[in-house]
């Protein structure tokens, strides 16, 4: 019975995508920067808008949950995996075009690569993003930022596809950007492309700023271990890393997951951690900080799949 059903599912899918871009039971530890996570029932690599619209229609017909994966650099997938479809954009979604001070980039393009292209074109405004390890789509969805810059500050418009396959463009105001959020985080849709508006600048100055931020990052962050970057959002009026340190949690472990001693705001995969280890440590940190300081730390990381004890 079960086999027949999944056979019928994949027949339809084979009409939409070539079979080398339809992966089943794909281990998600290969696709997240935490290097943890169980199998996704489907992992679909999508290269065109037409394919995307057809896949979204198929998912809706089959009532399958789906999640759009960028670089997996802000994502914790449960050890039992995800029983829906992971969508990953490639092909035409990787393109970047620069016209004067405007950059149009596909949602699958890497933010750090776009930042580098901007520097090479003598455009300033994206320096802050040079070390952020995500895609443009993910950066827009969560309004990624670092070193006093955020993507909202340079976004002119964002094109999305709704689950019904229709495309629409949001301007900056309509994007409703906030701290680590935007309209596309709060409603189901897929970011297709983004237009960024930068300023003409001095290439060598831009490059120097990027190198300086990069050195700062290496010095202060535990880049030598798998992690999802900053694990917690910044609580109003505090710094997460300092609260965690002051709570005596530097180096605290659950299984193979550890609060980085180099930067307490980072939970790292120190040694073969599972997602349950990471989730357990996040919970331990949250509870301890709440208890000691009465401050609620909210994870910045997205949890996908099953995290029941």
Question: Language model features by range: what are they?
Answer:
Residues 86, 127, 159, 301-302:
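Residues embedded in well-ordered beta-strands within globular domains across many folds
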Residues 4, 8, 29, 47-50, ...:
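Conserved active-site and cofactor/substrate-binding residues in soluble primary-metabolism enzymes
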Residues 4-136:
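Anion-binding (especially nucleotide phosphate/pyrophosphate-binding) glycine-rich loop
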Residues 23, 75, 161-288, 292-309:
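Phosphate/pyrophosphate- and phosphate-bearing ligand-binding catalytic cores of soluble enzymes
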Residues 62, 69-71, 154, 225-226, ...:
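Short, basic and Ser/Thr-rich N-terminal targeting/leader segments
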Residues 112, 142-144, 173-179:
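Short acidic (Asp/Glu) patches
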Residues 38, 44-49, 76-94, 141-172, ...:
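Structural signature of FAD isoalloxazine-binding scaffolds in flavoprotein oxidoreductases
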């Amino acid at each position: 019975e079960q086999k027949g059903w999944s056979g019928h599912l994949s027949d339809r899918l084979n009409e939409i995508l070539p079979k080398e871009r339809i992966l089943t039971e794909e281990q998600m530890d290969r696709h997240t920067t935490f290097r943890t996570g169980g199998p996704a029932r489907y992992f679909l690599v999508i290269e065109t808008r037409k394919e995307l619209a057809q896949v979204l229609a198929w998912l809706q017909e089959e009532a399958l949950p789906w999640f759009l994966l960028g670089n997996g650099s802000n994502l914790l997938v449960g050890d039992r995996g995800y029983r829906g479809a992971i969508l990953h954009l490639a092909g035409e979604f990787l393109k970047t075009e620069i016209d004067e001070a405007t950059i149009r980039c596909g949602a699958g393009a890497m933010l750090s690569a776009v930042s580098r292209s901007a520097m090479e074109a003598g455009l300033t405004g994206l320096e802050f993003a040079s070390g952020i390890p995500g895609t443009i789509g993910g950066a827009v969805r969560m309004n990624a930022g670092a070193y006093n810059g955020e993507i909202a500050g340079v976004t002119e418009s964002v094109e999305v596809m709704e689950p019904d396959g229709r495309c629409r463009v949001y301007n900056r105001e309509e994007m409703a950007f906030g701290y680590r959020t935007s309209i596309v985080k709060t409603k189901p849709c897929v970011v297709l492309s983004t237009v960024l508006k930068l300023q003409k600048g001095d290439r060598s100055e831009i490059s120097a700023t990027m190198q300086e931020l990069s050195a700062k990052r290496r010095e202060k962050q535990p880049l030598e271990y798998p992690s999802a970057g900053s694990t917690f959002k910044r609580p109003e009026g505090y710094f997460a890393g300092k609260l965690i340190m002051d709570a005596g949690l530097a180096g605290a472990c659950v299984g193979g997951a550890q609060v980085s001693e180099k930067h307490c705001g980072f939970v790292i995969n120190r040694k073969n951690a599972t997602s349950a280890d990471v989730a357990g440590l996040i919970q331990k940190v949250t509870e301890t900080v709440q208890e000691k300081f009465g401050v609620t730390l909210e994870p910045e990381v997205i949890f996908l799949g099953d995290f029941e004890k």
